[in-house]
């Protein structure tokens, strides 16, 4: 199948879940993102995953965030265009405060991802409600007491 130069077709089975995970994670390393996709059984090949991430970065749906993590880990976050694609697809997202301004918030989100992954790997996790969904729900009458980072 041929596509017009500069355009891309998003896979509902592979691209959308990856974009959703980046959005819900706030900040996420490449290794964390691959582990989420592997645990969701949407990606089994690291090579295919890396190609998918490069393609989504190249089209401006995911942003690389250099210098935010120590070591050699690449950190990613959702771009405004990526969030817009997901909102158009029905994703709940009311925005996120202070996520783009403070380096410390990056470390916080990366640690939260590690907690999420550890609970998932141990099979102790029944349901994880991400901050994006909590903040969106808090705009309705069915609200939490505050904007939590996650509800387990």
Please annotate each region the language model reported:
Residues 1-99:
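Nuclease-adjacent, charged terminal/linker segments that flank catalytic cores
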Residues 65-66, 104-106, 118-152:
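Active-site metal-binding core of divalent-cation-utilizing nuclease and nuclease-like domains
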Residues 74, 113, 146-149:
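Generic beta-strand structural signal
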Residues 96-113:
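A short, highly charged nucleic-acid-interacting micro-segment common to nuclease
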